[in-house]
């Protein structure tokens, strides 16, 4: 079964902010390569999303939240892609990408998790 992929506005804003950071700290080419790799990883979620680990921060969320770690290069910065799985009899099963976060940031708080969920 193939899952549909949907990104929240917050996830899109996270991608745009990271792209801007890479373009300013390195180059637009580096930013484009990072975004292309990220989008490829997100697209791969359509195949077996439930095979990925539940996020360590899952207890902060109301819905089961999974995490995919993305790193464009072996030594490059890691980004966490937080997502939920949505199923209903009326719609195709959907992976909803909620938030993309640099892995070196401070640990997520319960308040941040609630804000992420409310941005759905």
Q: What kind of feature is each model-predicted range?
A:
Residues 1-41:
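Arg/Lys-rich, positively charged N-terminal/basic patches that mediate binding to nucleic acids
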Residues 1-2, 62, 84, 112:
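Small, basic N-terminal interaction modules of short regulatory proteins
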Residues 31, 53-57, 109:
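Short, hydrophobic secondary-structure boundary micro-motifs
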Residues 39-51:
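Compact soluble domain cores
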Residues 48-90:
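Basic/aromatic recognition patch in beta-strand/loop cores that engages polyanionic ligands
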Residues 72-120:
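Enriched for short, Lys/Arg-rich terminal
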């Amino acid at each position: 079964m193939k899952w549909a992929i949907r990104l929240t506005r917050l996830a899109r804003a996270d991608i745009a902010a990271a792209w801007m950071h890479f373009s300013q700290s390195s180059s637009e080419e580096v930013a484009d390569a990072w975004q292309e790799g990220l989008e490829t990883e997100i697209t791969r979620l359509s195949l077996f999303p439930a095979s990925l680990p539940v996020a360590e921060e899952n207890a902060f969320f109301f819905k089961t939240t999974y995490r995919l770690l993305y790193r464009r290069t072996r030594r490059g910065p890691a980004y966490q892609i937080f997502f939920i799985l949505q199923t209903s009899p009326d719609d195709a099963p959907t992976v909803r990408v909620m938030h993309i976060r640099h892995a070196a940031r401070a640990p997520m708080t319960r308040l941040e998790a609630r804000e992420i969920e409310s941005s759905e």
